[in-house]
Amino acid sequence: MEESELTQNETEELKASVSAVEFIHIAQRDLEQCLFADSLVTVSDSGRELGDFSVSVTKASYNEELCYLLHANSHGTIDDVPCGTSIVAYISRKLEILEENHHEYVKLEKKTVDRKIHIVRQDDQLVVDRVISEREGVKTQTLKFPLSSLDGFVSEASNFLLLRIMARQKIVPENMTFLSLDADSGLSKSVYKALGWQKQMVGEDLVDIFGIERTIYSANLSSATWHCFFMPDGHLASRVQLGSPAVMKLLHLPFLLDGVIKTFFFLVEKDKIPVMEKKPLIWEEDMELYSKFLDRKEELKADYSSYLRQHPELKALLADFLQFLLLRKPQDVFSFARDFFAPFASQSPPGKSQEF
């Protein structure tokens, strides 16, 4: 394993702007308004559907600290190449990354490139573990960044929350330069700029959308730029990386239900969970035994529901695993599952809620 540690001297020339550091100290009420799900479709220049994209933010807890759980997911086939990205992260109320898992894959004709990145705060450092699997073998690397040099740091996960906040405020202040990681996990600058207003067809409706540009300037790689457009309430309407042959678009307007914005989220729908029919047994005719059975059943359901509420990442983890499994359709499911979870099994998490 390759390991490197960046000292303060090595990172001091990379700093977020004062306005960016001030902006990141966001009022709690602004963050609370960004807790919803977006679901978009990935389409080609000709309008052909290539895949799907979703991102959701919910309340959660991490090592007994109230925080937010973000799950972003993108899967599809671009230029006849299956590919996908999944991000699961715990984000503090100060937009600090507590822990983040980032998984990307590209399934080429003769090989599959698989990249997993795990980010976690440990003591006074941000630790980044990289595992890249290719046909030639597995490469691992650990990077450590002192937290004292990361004021104004925004990861891929916290970027989604930051964009929603800017979109709801309908303004991007001048000189919004944050710190971020490039594709090789090198510390880089991430610059946000307003693109102004334009119109977009969503279903049968013509809506006004506000655009934000994000560019990551890397010292060793070419810069990468994304254009994201949002509806006035912060819902994502379109997203594209410049140079990519695909764009993500919102096909249907979110709808209002009981005063809460709801969107269709494609991962797991609780109403579609199969229910096993109960086989009649003789003991059911005994009122006392049947009453005890119902009491125990409700007790277990409450216990399971409590566990799921305490670990919302379980839904995201299982959904990701099933999607990767169905996309690749391996002959040996057990080996595939072992390889999928192996990079995370060797991690040494500092808190209770970070095992994905």
Curated annotation (Swiss-Prot):
Belongs to the CATIP family. Disruption phenotype: Morpholino knockdown of the protein causes curved body, a lack of defined brain structures or necrosis in the developing brain, and eye formation defects at 24 hpf. At 48 hpf, show a reduction in number of ciliated cells within the olfactory organ. The gene is catip. InterPro entries: CATIP_N, DD_CATIP. This is Ciliogenesis-associated TTC17-interacting protein. Keywords: Cell membrane, Cilium biogenesis/degradation, Cytoplasm, Cytoskeleton, Membrane, Nucleus. The keyword Nucleus applies. PANTHER family: CILIOGENESIS-ASSOCIATED TTC17-INTERACTING PROTEIN, RIIA DOMAIN-CONTAINING PROTEIN 1. It is found in: Nucleus; Cytoplasm; Cell membrane; Cytoplasm, Cytoskeleton. The keyword Hydrolase does not apply. The lineage of its organism: Eukaryota, Metazoa, Chordata, Craniata, Vertebrata. It comes from the Eukaryota. CDD domains: DD_CATIP (cd22973). It holds the Pfam family CATIP_N. Plays a role in primary ciliogenesis by modulating actin polymerization. One of its GO terms (cellular component) is plasma membrane. Expressed in tissues rich in motile cilia. One of its GO terms (biological process) is actin filament polymerization.
